[in-house]
Amino acid sequence: RDLQELSKTFLPDGIQGDTRYDYQKIRDKKINENFTIYILSNQHEINFRAVLAHELMHVYLFVNNISLRNSLVEGFCNLGTEHVYRSYPNSKIGQLKLKAMAKDKDPEYGKGYRIMSSELKNIGWKNLIGKLEKY
C-alpha cells in the first residue's frame, strides 16, 4: 500500500512513516493493544533510524495516553528524529536533515518541533516528559 494513502496526510516531501494504534476496551480498560509501524523502504540507514525513532515516540504517547494538539505531537515525535541525527555528528545526512528540520515551515512538523526542541533544551528530558500532559 502507498504510505501517503495509508496515513491520509500530505507533506510536500512525502510521508516516511506512520504509526497505527488499535485497542479494545472492556469497562473503560484498554485490552489487546496493537501498534503497527509502517516505514518507507529503501531509505539510508540513518534516515530509517530517524523515522523509526519518530514513530516510536508516537507509541510512547499512545501507551501513556498523552493527548497533545497535533503540532506538539509531531514536534515531540521529531525529538526522536533529532536525537538520531545528532547521534551521527560526522554524517552529512544528519547535518542536512537537522538544518532542514530547523527551517521547516510546516506548522506541525516544523514549528511544533522547534517549540518542543526549545523546551527540551531548557528543561531536559525528565522535566519535559513530566510536563507533557500540561501542554
What are these regions (language model features)?
Residues I31-L52, N64-L68:
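Short pre-active-site segment immediately N-terminal to the catalytic Zn-binding motif
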Residues A50-V63, E74, N78:
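Active-site recognition of the HExxH zinc-binding catalytic motif
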Residues V59, V63, H83, S87, ...:
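Structured segments of extracytoplasmic/periplasmic soluble domains
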Residues I66-K105:
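Post-HExxH zinc-binding segment in Zn-dependent metallohydrolases
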Residues R1-F35, N42:
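Auxiliary, metal-adjacent structural segments of Zn-dependent hydrolase domains
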Residues K92, K99-Y135:
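Pan-zinc metallopeptidase signature
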